[in-house]
């Protein structure tokens, strides 16, 4: 059964960064994005794009398909909530 209210993938990534002891600035540099772009993702203001999913995969954080599935599940749940309102 699908989760009715999955967390934003940025929350998962934020937990991963904390567990690895990495800062937002350091991680943004490794990902090749701005600190602001990563911060928006971590705070649920932006989603994980295919390019970001691949960048995360290259750094060893699971695979790109995993990140895209998290984003798709989140987006679908959000749309279901909007349509139910």
Region spans (language model):
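Short amphipathic recognition helices of helix-turn-helix/homeodomain-type DNA-binding modules
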Residues: 66-83
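A short, Lys/Arg-rich alpha-helix, primarily the initiator
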Residues: 1-22, 65-69
């Amino acid at each position: 059964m699908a989760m009715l209210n999955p967390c934003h993938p940025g929350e998962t990534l934020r937990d991963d960064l904390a567990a690895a002891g990495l800062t937002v600035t350091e991680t943004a540099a490794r990902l090749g994005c701005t600190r602001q772009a990563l911060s928006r993702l971590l705070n649920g203001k932006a989603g994980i794009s295919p390019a970001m999913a691949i960048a995360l995969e290259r750094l060893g954080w699971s695979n790109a398909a995993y990140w895209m599935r998290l984003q798709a599940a989140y987006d679908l749940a959000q749309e279901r909530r909007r349509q139910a309102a």
